[in-house]
Amino acid sequence: MEDDAGNCGGLTAFALRLAKRLADDGDNSNRNVVFSPVSLYAALALVASGARGTTLDELVALLGAASLDDLEESVRRAVEVGLADESESGGPRVSYACGVWHDERLALKPAYRAADFQRQPKSSRKKINKWVSKATNKLIREILPDGSVHGGTALVLVNAIYFKGKWSNPFPRERTTTGKFHRLDGSSVDAPFMSSREDQYIGFYDGFKVLKLPYHRTMKNHGDGGDITPAILKHYGENVGLSMYIFLPDARDGLPALVDKMAVASSGTASSSFLRDHRPGRRRIKVGDLRVPRFKVSFYSEMNEVLKGMGIGAAFDVGKVDLSGMIDGELVVVEKVMHRAVVEVNEEGTEAAAATACTMKFLCLTLTSPVDFVADHPFAFFVVEEKSDAVLFAGHVLDPTSLE
């Protein structure tokens, strides 16, 4: 498992830096935030696969990779290991789907799903949203809002993730009670709190505590296929299966400082190990008062400005973008990166889904819609050699019927 964690170090660092950016965004200052780092990471990596020059360099740097090959390997490991479905072995259900839709007149490298963005943008948008809804078990019914697909759309990259897992030790529903949840502004709100008398994995650190809530699973091809036992954990190590980690600052208003601390760590050499280094030990400990709120959080954001602030301006800049490795003979620019996520945590476990969509538009009008060019009034002309830009002839025409 250590190798897997190392290969996903760029993803971990990206997750912590993005958490900081989203927390600092003024629009999010008073609302819950949930996002899927792996969904966004995979979407941006797909854009990087068709990028060249500065556009590629910025994407690779943001995603914490040494090269495009290194980035592609990181994504492969994240999908194969981090998003591996464990439902057949009694563990969480995890599904991941990736789709690419391109304007039907394009020659994409390689070819993916074709769509008639020019003549049927609304139906194309609905078709993609329907695909996302199915991939997320209807938790996310729309990733592309009205107007996000239009006649000038060249390409839409989409991925979707669905997760459903039961706790290894569920919270008894009869122990759920209403209590005060203290918000950052000092006010409080009544919320349902889950509780348990079971021993728990809890780690104590400078200024914060960490609770680990493992999801139920069984070990494939091990003995009689029963539950993971302490002996199995000792043999395989602590990092077995999927778990939720709750980072709780000691101070009621300490979350911003904790997020800052994570972001600072993500920019250094220890970026890939911060979360790993702050996991509780492998022994459960007795707890007195254990209360975790039951919640459901949904979040939608157009990520352009956040991503620009993290260093990938060229992909959105018509004067700098280079995505020539993706589409033959056409200039395109990233128009929008949209992300939606939902997470529900209750006594039984967790159900969550996320989707990321990246739309690209043409830089010129050659394919967006038919245009008129009627030279029925005076015009200028130039005869230019393309490679050297040498102008061989130049002039203007005031009357095409006159020799002079």
Curated annotation (Swiss-Prot):
Q: Where is this site: Reactive bond?
A: 363-364
Annotated region (RCL) at 349-373
Source organism superkingdom: Eukaryota
Annotated Gene Ontology cellular component terms: extracellular space
Q: Give one Pfam family.
A: Serpin
Q: Does the keyword Amino-acid biosynthesis apply?
A: no
Q: List keywords of the entry alphabetically.
A: Protease inhibitor, Serine protease inhibitor
Any one GO MF term held by the record is: serine-type endopeptidase inhibitor activity
What stretch or stretches form a coiled coil here? none
Q: What does this protein do?
A: Probable serine protease inhibitor.
* Protein family per UniProt: Belongs to the serpin family.
Provide the domain comment: The reactive center loop (RCL) extends out from the body of the protein and directs binding to the target protease. The protease cleaves the serpin at the reactive site within the RCL, establishing a covalent linkage between the carboxyl group of the serpin reactive site and the serine hydroxyl of the protease. The resulting inactive serpin-protease complex is highly stable.
What is the protein name for this chain?
A: Serpin-Z2B
Q: Which organism is it from?
A: Oryza sativa subsp. japonica
